């Protein structure tokens, strides 16, 4: 290509577009570096922004070339086109560098560093936990359940765990009772038989037995909040369902509530050290031996 061809409008425009594409790619790389990998929401938005930016640049470059092909070649046109292209603020050094020095970018980087530090602490805690109470408890429970050809069925730790575990087992038996149903029936049963439950409920501040008002609130909370359920609620549910409820524990023998009933027992797993949040209930299911047999 001679000097004249190199300085033609088309050659200059193509050269300028190539430069612009490189600058856009630099900006895209900067955008990628500015968003933490574990921030899925922002990375999804970033991916959409990048795709939109690339599509806009590609479309505009095509329009510029088509427009150039339809116009007579004049020296002033080259200046007009190239000036218009260079004036576009897509990949200049200032926008590329700006995210690294802006206050917003610094806040994002600080947040990303804090999230990384938190993830590192969680990872360290998980490693330490391999010899901790939670791991030992899980191992012991797995051994106890395996002897019955059962395994733990994980239940979310959201305050409803006991009710969800019972719901799971009832559903396995074809019973469609929900957590809401179980909570409502539990509260109703306890309210109608307050004398059977009041002696076991005390005010944590005074140590005194619940008043009628406190007991009423306790029952209302069972229905309207994710209040954690315990042995009193299990006793009520055993009578409601006319079914024994067996609670397996790692550190002591199983507890059976409602032994007077002959229906197939509901089996729960009580975990004292689960999730670092304290007491928790899981359900059980048949042991999956497919991995061992494969």
Swiss-Prot record:
Does the keyword field hold Magnesium? no
Q: Which SUPFAM superfamilies match?
A: Cysteine proteinases
- Segments carrying the region annotation (Variable-loop) are 222-232
Write out the catalysed reaction.
Answer: Thiol-dependent hydrolysis of ester, thioester, amide, peptide and isopeptide bonds formed by the C-terminal Gly of ubiquitin (a 76-residue protein attached to proteins as an intracellular targeting signal)
Q: Where is this region: His-loop?
A: 270-280
Whether Flavoprotein counts among this entry's keywords is no
Which EC numbers does the record give? 3.4.19.12
Q: What is this protein called?
A: Deubiquitinase OTUD6B
